[in-house]
Every structure is written in structure tokens, then in C-alpha cells.
């Protein structure tokens, strides 16, 4: 049991359908309160339905990935962790897609539709050579780009950061996604449909101690993604849609080795569950942001509250003192 379960099964139903909850629980309500709750329920659900429609709609109908006979999916960092879970989910859901996995090591997923492209994303020459290959052989068939690859430095204080590590982290976490989008996304006037997913991190918003380099690289990715998305929206681009994923801690190797505090409020996310949600968004062509777990939807709000409240929340959550020294 955690806060996500309570919100999903108690808080959100109560907020969306208060009158229905009252009827189920046989609460005694006056006529005026019942009318107000009915109007509220209709308005809030109308807004949520309209919001979902806007995120998924466009002047041109969005095609299912199943409609592309020789569709190509490009994913970085698909050999382990969340990337591997996304690859497995795509293979399970679609029999028509070929997946190009860009990683420093081969994928452990054994399938003829998965093609490994070995590349160190921190090496400029290797990235340039790979991009030339992709543009020559696959560019016009790429329907989905998932920028998932990410690395972190050792957990260390601000003064312990090294320039070489900073360069490597930013090249992989920030600059590589930009290059892949710039070189492989369709032009604004093309008819080729393409969905772009950038996997960031809630640490790019909350910026805890000892992960300054990683948090900064993800913060930069978030800013680049949002600016790019608003640019597409402003220019009326119809064939490109984007999704920003800002997860909390995942059950992967990257942040393994310590027990996260306050898991009731900040539960560790199962990568299989998150991968299924990401693939579902890809299928629907849903724009916007995917935040998991629940608290991630309020991270920006936390960073906007008065300093004293921030200190209280951060002290309670132990976000700045939970990471070990490495």
C-alpha cells in the first residue's frame, strides 16, 4: 500500500464522482448539495474528457503503429532497464515493427526484429557515423524515436564533480537526444508520421544533493523537449507528436544499492508497468507528459512554494540525505 494506490482508488474517484460515491455510501445529502455535486461531476469530467481529446487529436488522423507495414522504431539504451522493457512491450504488441537498439552493448532480448547498433553516445565520431548510417538506410521509415539512454556519475558532493564526467553525462543524457531528433525526425512539411519520446527524470526538477550532474542533464533535456514541443505546436506541425516521461525511481540498476526512504509517498516504479503506459501513449499519439509515480505530477509545485515549506518537505522526504557516498 502506498500513496499512489490511495489516490487511484480513493482520492481520485472521490474528486471525479463525489455524487456517485455519496450514493454508494448512502450519505444523506440535501437537494441543493446533490445538484451542486451533479454539476461539479459533469464539469470536471467534461474537462478531463476534453483534455484527453485535445492531447490525442489533430487536423490529420493519427495512425496506429500497426498500420505501418515496415515501421522502424529507434530506441537508445534499449539493452537494459526501462529501455529493455519498452522493447519487450513493443515486440509483444506489434508484429510489424523492426526495432533499432542503439546501445553500448547488445540487447539481451533475442528476437530477429531487434537489430543492435553498437554505439558509445559520448563519442562524437561514433554518433556522427551512426546518424549517417541511419539517415541513409532508415530515415524515411522511422515512426517512433525513444530517447531512453542515460548515465549518471558516482553519488558525490558538488565539489567532487569532474569535468570529464560532466561532459560524458551531458553528451549521453542531453545532446544525443537532440541530435537524434534534429537528424532523424521528419521535416515540418513531410507527411511521415513520427512520435518522439524523451525519457527524463523527476530529479531534473527536484534536483537533490549528490546527483547534480545527472539532475542538470535531465533538467536541460526537459527544457529542450518542452521548447521543441511548443515550437511544433506554434507552427501547426501535424506529423510529429512528442511525449516527455518524468519518472521517479525505477527498479533498475542505475539507482540500485540503497533503500529509498518514504516509499509510501514515493514508491519505486516497476519498469514493466511504466513501459506498457509509454507504449500505450505511443499507440494513441498522445501528447504531453507522463509522470509516475503520483507525486511527480506536483514536483514543479513543490519548487514554487515558499522556501520554508520546501525545507520542511525536503527534510521530511529525506531526498537530500538518502544517497550514499560512492
From Swiss-Prot:
Membrane topology type: Multi-pass membrane protein
Signal sequence, renumbered to the chain: none
PANTHER family: AER111WP, PKSB
Catalytic residues, chain numbering: 214 (proton acceptor), 218 (lowers pka of active site tyr)
Predominant location: mitochondrion
Location within or outside the cell: Mitochondrion membrane
Family note: Belongs to the short-chain dehydrogenases/reductases (SDR) family.
Residues annotated as transmembrane: 9-29, 33-53
Function comment: Involved in the resistance to DNA-damaging agents.
Keyword Mitochondrion on entry: yes
Protein name stated in the entry: Uncharacterized oxidoreductase TDA5
Example of a GO cellular component annotation carried by this entry: mitochondrion
Keywords per UniProt: Membrane, Mitochondrion, NADP, Oxidoreductase, Transmembrane, Transmembrane helix
Lineage top rank: taxon: Eukaryota
Pfam families: adh_short
Gene Ontology molecular function: oxidoreductase activity, acting on the CH-OH group of donors, NAD or NADP as acceptor
Matches recorded under InterPro entries: NAD(P)-bd_dom_sf, Sc_DH/Rdtase_CS, SDR_fam
Other information: Present with 2130 molecules/cell in log phase SD medium.
Enzyme Commission identifier(s): 1.-.-.-
Result of knocking out the encoding gene: Leads to cell death when overexpressing the camptothecin mimetic TOP1-T(722)A mutant.
